[in-house]
């Protein structure tokens, strides 16, 4: 998801990470290539560029390595026949109706999966790992690097970060922002956006409780329902003892792919025939 203040135009290509190219005193030209899988452009004659590409390529396609000790578990799945959720309010484990993964896919059979909440008060590697992932996400979306204050503050809870872990790799993330005002009431940041024109409806300020600041899934794990599962688990764990309804979730000016997800998740059809998306600014 794009940050709410970003000026990125819809459909624009993301800025790709690239180091300073080595000219080698002009005696050797640099051959710029573009990876067809991660879409990064880099110099094939630069050792530094190749190293940066290898790291970026792995993160984009397969996510980041994640220690089993990082994060507080809020959702676990041990196999594809049973999905469970750990309730923070009751401490009990209850089955969920559906798995986010396709049982027919042989490449994901018998994989341990979980969703964790990133604890900002921890000085270990989980905060650094999350920050590294967000650098990748923001570069891909060409978005400002200003969302970390939402989830990593130890003095004021402005929101939370959740990470989807598969076989000790972070393959998806979501940053949720609280839209409550200082008096506990919802703020006036909510808007309706017309899906096809991306135009905001004027003089209408709906109440939304939480906003999706960022949502991202690595390339090899997309179209498996992971993004939807992240939103569902976040709704159940962002506010202690409360499940936020779908209609009170807003999006931070969604990208093209984010808009498609939003339209399916909680878009509403206006009497005019226009599809409206809940957004916030």
UniProtKB/Swiss-Prot annotation:
Disulfide bond positions: none
Coiled-coil residue spans: none
PTM annotation: Autoacetylates in vitro.
Source domain of life: Eukaryota
Region (Disordered): 86-105
Effect on the protein of changing residue 53 to Y: In ctf7-108; loss of function
This protein's UniProt keywords: Acetylation, Acyltransferase, Cell cycle, DNA replication, Metal-binding, Nucleus, Transferase, Zinc, Zinc-finger
UniProt-listed PANTHER family: N-ACETYLTRANSFERASE ECO
Quaternary structure and interacting proteins, as annotated: Binds specifically to CHL12, RFC1, RFC2, RFC3, RFC4, RFC5 and RAD24 when members of an RFC complex. Interacts with CHL1 and MPS3.
Annotated function: Required for establishment of sister chromatid cohesion during S phase but not for its further maintenance during G2 or M phases or for loading the cohesin complex onto DNA. Interacts with the three known alternate replication factor C (RFC) complexes, suggesting that these complexes have essential but redundant activity in cohesion establishment. Acts by acetylating the cohesin complex component SMC3. In vitro, possesses acetyltransferase activity where it can acetylate itself and components of the cohesin complex (MCD1, IRR1 and PDS5), but is unable to acetylate histones.
Name the UniProt record assigns to this protein: N-acetyltransferase ECO1
Organism expressing this protein natively: Saccharomyces cerevisiae (strain ATCC 204508 / S288c)
Lineage: Eukaryota, Fungi, Dikarya, Ascomycota, Saccharomycotina
Gene: ECO1
